[in-house]
Each structure stands twice: as C-alpha cells, then as structure tokens.
Amino acid sequence: MVSKKVYFLTSNPHKAKEVSDVLSQFSIEVVPLKGEKLEIQADSVEEVARFAAEEAKKRFKERPLLLEDSGLFVDALKGFPGPYSNYVYRTLGLEGLLKLMEGVEDRRARFVCAAALVKEDDKIVIEVGEVEGEIAYEPRGDKGFGFDPIFVPLGYEKTFAELGEEVKKRISHRARAFMKIAKHLSGE
C-alpha cells in the first residue's frame, strides 16, 4: 500500500528504478519527473545537489521533489573523479578510469550520494549516503550502470554490477541517502 507519492527529477532510468526500489520499502511511490537538473561545477556532491534543488524548486511545482548528485571518489586519485563522475564516465569510460589506476596498489574508493528533498513548504533537506570499497582491476558484471562494474563494496568480493539490484538497494550510497530521506517523508 502506498502512503505517499514523491517526484524524482532525473534523466537516468537506472537511478529512478534504484530510488523507487529503496523508497517502496517505506510505502513511498516514486514518480519520475522528466527534465534536466541544473548543475554547477563544485568540489562536493552536496554543493551540486543543493544548487540543483534550489533551481528545481523554481522550475517545477511538484512537491515533494527529490533529486540527487553522486560521485565516485578514488583515494589514489585524490578524490577524482568525485563530483565530475558523470562527465568522466561519458568521456573516459570504465577503461579510461582503469588506465589512470594502472600500477596503483591503493585501490580504495567510495561512492557518495547527496539526496535532496524539496519539501511541501519549499524547505530543502540534504542527506548524504556513502559506501566504502575499492576499484577492481577490470570491469566485472552486467547488472549495474555507470561505474558499478569496477566498484567492489567493502565486505564483498563482487562488484556492484555482479551483486545486482537486491544487494545494491540495501547497501549502495544512493540507498543509504534515500533511506535517510524516507524518514523526512514519513514525518512530513
């Protein structure tokens, strides 16, 4: 039974499904809202998400409104690609990032998601979710998207793309951020 409906601004159907899977556990229905979120170049996904939420609340009337920004932060690359992950994925791809990691022993990395909620009263709430892990030596698996085939979450031997949706919707950075958002939605 659905107790609440929210709108999720994204152009990525994979993210829409992941967020829907997470929030459905809290009886929250996610309605994808087509449109581009306006982004700034910033050093943190939180800054990008906050700016995008401020802009989205001016352009869209639907409430509550959700959006997110996320990034892969690789320790040996001083946090790169971080908030530029989408651009790096589109231009360099998995192989390009792996090339940057050639000969690098320190494979530690983390995915960070900043989920933004524009509430009924137009107040903005930002919640952050993180998952620690490491960069694999080659792409593995076909169940994910983005950098999932090269990210092995801490405590696992498989990449996100090998683990699949059932595990990812419990442990991913996006799942962790939106589980926190669910508490705000339940209390509204």
Swiss-Prot record:
GO terms for cellular component: cytoplasm
Binding sites annotated in the UniProt record for Mg(2+): E39, D69
GO molecular function: dITP diphosphatase activity; ITP diphosphatase activity; metal ion binding; nucleotide binding; ribonucleoside triphosphate phosphatase activity; XTP diphosphatase activity
Residues that bind substrate: T10, S11, N12, P13, H14, K15, S70, F145, G146, F147, D148, K168, H173, R174
EC nos: 3.6.1.66
One Gene Ontology biological process: nucleotide metabolic process
Enzyme superclass (EC): hydrolase
Keyword hit for Oxidoreductase: no
InterPro entries: dITP/XTP_pyrophosphatase (IPR020922), ITPase-like_fam (IPR029001), RdgB/HAM1 (IPR002637)
Cofactor(s) in the UniProt record: Mg(2+)
Cofactor binding, note field: Binds 1 Mg(2+) ion per subunit.
Reactions performed catalytically: XTP + H2O = XMP + diphosphate + H(+); dITP + H2O = dIMP + diphosphate + H(+); ITP + H2O = IMP + diphosphate + H(+)
Entry annotation: catalytic residues: D69
Keyword Nucleotide-binding on entry: yes
SUPFAM superfamilies the record matches: ITPase-like
UniProt keyword terms in alphabetical order: Hydrolase, Magnesium, Metal-binding, Nucleotide metabolism, Nucleotide-binding
Subunit structure, as described in the record: Homodimer.
Function of the protein: Pyrophosphatase that catalyzes the hydrolysis of nucleoside triphosphates to their monophosphate derivatives, with a high preference for the non-canonical purine nucleotides XTP (xanthosine triphosphate), dITP (deoxyinosine triphosphate) and ITP. Seems to function as a house-cleaning enzyme that removes non-canonical purine nucleotides from the nucleotide pool, thus preventing their incorporation into DNA/RNA and avoiding chromosomal lesions.
Family: Belongs to the HAM1 NTPase family.
Descriptive protein name: dITP/XTP pyrophosphatase
Source organism (scientific name): Ignicoccus hospitalis (strain KIN4/I / DSM 18386 / JCM 14125)
Taxonomic placement: Archaea, Thermoproteota, Thermoprotei, Desulfurococcales, Desulfurococcaceae
